[in-house]
């Protein structure tokens, strides 16, 4: 095609002719059989392409280079006879006379740091019983999400996890762990089963940069939002990153263990950008997979140097192929999309349709961040809050309106929210309870489209935020009774609201990062889950546990019925109190005929009127499990504790 500038390439890639002549709908990547392996690579602008063969994934010489044959739509391929399992390879792609050695964008396994791709017989990576592993059935009433990094989950020595498995996939498979082995306070998988969450959302588990898999991990740390290979797991989370099949098998073992515990697995996916511009996609088809400005320079809507061009046909195919692969090969139960606002609406809806077409695919969750990390060249409908009405109703969004209303803005550490007494914020609490279905701000198709939360891996932990609002110089490791009460109130609001409840791991035991708001590459010690705090704040853990169970006992709060929030009746109360009632849906198995809920963000007790009838106290400011016993029944009026969410059930 001749030497082209980035601006000329942009014009070419966005032309109808290029799309017509190069769009390919067939399989790409390695196709293994015992008799041989077919490799396919989409590289329509290449003049030449070859495969380089290696015996090892690192520190070994090339044992041969073979030319690939060009076919229609720019797909290059080669047949490698014989059993190729365990062999490593790269491609050399020549464009405009420049040869680049690169990994396979569709590789299913890789060597150290993912620099070489690996041919793998996936059947040999299946853990025992994998063929019987199925996605757990989690009804909407039981859906809740607990977000954690694989590394954070178990790297604390107090976790009780065997040393070789700390910070690894296999930590999720170890049962019976307790704090310092005390046999009393459960940690890790046993802790999760007791807590009662429906899903674990794993921060990026695909192969990422910024952690050198060839070096000890004692001081290395990264969240993983630096993708290098999208279709196989991160090696630093495996016990042997040099052997490509190990990371695949151990990732599957983790998923199987969570499934056996009745917990679904949601994968945090970061297709919106890649770690470096020199990557497996750009080395294969220069500038195709990433948006450019008009002058050909890179658009940077991710804030990370580049952004994925989801609207281009083969980029869209790549993203959807990858999602389908993880759903089918790894039995993933849901996907969380980082910076979802960088994808176009059509791609997100196409991904939803593709997942729906899988057996059981309609139960696979999809939700994401409906914003971008900077100005973007995506000049069509972005998958953001403004275009929520254009997204499939089973594509959800993180609701920063709910987050900020409850605890205050995330970009100003000292800005209060409702639980800290911000004047006028009670109006937004009503919107949050209804999952904004009764608001003009961002009416969703259904309440289940709203992810209700107050903390995630980004920004301050809830505990740190509460202390920053209360004190100019907080002591983050000190206990604080008022902050604990405000923490319980925050949980009491979003766990009694419509929508999909979501929490950062450790929020339920006052997790602190000592005021660090962006710990993506801070020390492992700062990021780890401090399991001693789960013991220290066991009463707070039990408060979350009780609310999660209470929510499951009143299914209407988790409903997918778009009209359900219309049944909410709000009371006219003295500001800033908020109160409401909600009848149970007919035949949904609710334990109570209706709920009556009050929020009190003040430092004094308040008396409120109750609707007619008898109301059993289910939860108050200190205990969320009163409903499990013979709790008191109230009529006409009730007393609200300071900084409290109080829940009654009609009897």
Where are the predicted features?
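The feature marks proteins involved in alpha-glucan
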Residues: 1-34, 70-174
